[in-house]
Design a protein with these regions (language model features):
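Amphipathic alpha-helical interface elements
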Residues: 2-121, 125-217
């Protein structure tokens, strides 16, 4: 079941296929299909090298750190846009947890912030103990909260554990209950679905505030 959620879904679908490290023939095929690539104001959160490394890594810790980096960029984007700053956090190091609090003070929806915190707690666990385990209970908690987020397109994003919900990530086809799916693949799958819902929420929230927002290259 291919993701369908208007233009946002199309962008997401292409991005998780590793667009950004394409051959000239693949780029031409995209152009012929009228497909655009994620960029603009959210380029930092969809950095080609980071996303490509995330889709291809077999290392759980590496995946967690890259997801954390991308989520931090989403927080930066929120704070930059709502304050009309090019770099809101240009005054020195601010930890991820404090960035969440600042973003919430600046209007970031609470339902998004809760999921940011859950991903951050996993990252922090690894930061203090590289032998730490991510439990299925932790992942299910994130999954349920992602599924509860609103959809902003004409066709809703399926529930993460919908048996028909499959999506390509790198050279794999992932589904929540896929045969032999690893913890690393599950957390990557959750992140990509969450990033799609973040993007949809940002489009809606910035439009409501009359803030210009460009998410294509």
């Amino acid at each position: 079941m291919r993701l369908q959620n208007d233009l946002i879904s199309e962008l997401f679908y292409m991005k998780i296929n590793g667009i950004g490290v394409t051959s000239p023939d693949q780029e031409m095929n995209m152009m012929n299909q009228g497909i655009v690539r994620i960029g603009g104001d959210v380029f930092g959160a969809f950095d080609d090298e980071v996303i490509t490394a995330l889709t291809n890594t077999q290392d759980l810790i590496g995946a967690v750190l890259r997801i954390h980096f991308c989520l931090e960029e989403f927080l930066n984007i929120w704070c930059n846009k709502v304050t009309d700053n090019k770099d809101f956090f240009d005054f020195g190091f601010i930890g991820f947890d404090k960035k969440i609090k600042i973003a919430v003070k600046l209007g970031l929806p609470e339902n998004l912030s809760i999921i940011f915190k859950l991903f951050n707690s996993i990252r922090n666990k690894y930061a203090h103990d590289t032998s730490a385990k991510i439990t299925i209970e932790q992942l299910n908690d994130i999954r349920i909260k992602i599924d509860s987020l609103p959809n902003f397109g004409s066709q809703p994003i399926p529930k993460c554990d919908d048996p028909l919900f499959e999506t390509p990530v790198g050279d794999k086809i992932l589904s929540w209950n896929g045969i032999n799916i690893s913890t690393k693949d599950r957390i990557v799958f959750l992140y990509f679905v969450f990033s799609m819902k973040i993007l949809g929420a940002y489009v809606a929230e910035f439009h409501k505030r009359g803030i210009s927002f460009n998410y294509v290259r």
